[in-house]
Amino acid sequence: MTNPNTEYDSPWKEIIQLYFEDFMLFFFPQVHQEIDWSRGFEFLDQELQQVVRDAELGKRLVDKLVKVYRRTGEEIWVLVHIEIQAQEEGKFPERMFVYNYRIFDRYKRPVASLAVLADSSSTWRPNQFGYELF
């Protein structure tokens, strides 16, 4: 039996890999405008695997780490994380936070974490992670 997540994983990876600039324009037009596309971009799949391989944070679907340059000349890394699911997942905001922090901690580069939630719920749209001690 085929895992439903696997069915969605490969096409999303191919779309991002082959059409990254168009993908960013469609899903993240404001971010797209800030990128200097004339300088190109570089997928950092090996760097991402170094950071997340030991994470015990639940399922990972399509994750891409891409080095781009802002129009200001600043190098930034963009973490694109795509969740394909039909229900809420409580660990998603935490996982995004952990990936962002681990990338920054290991490589000392600013990271923009972007998510495409491809589930059918219009009410579940996590936009932050936090916790309180007191």
Regions found by a protein language model. Give the residues of each.
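Accessory alpha/beta interaction modules
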Residues: 1-134
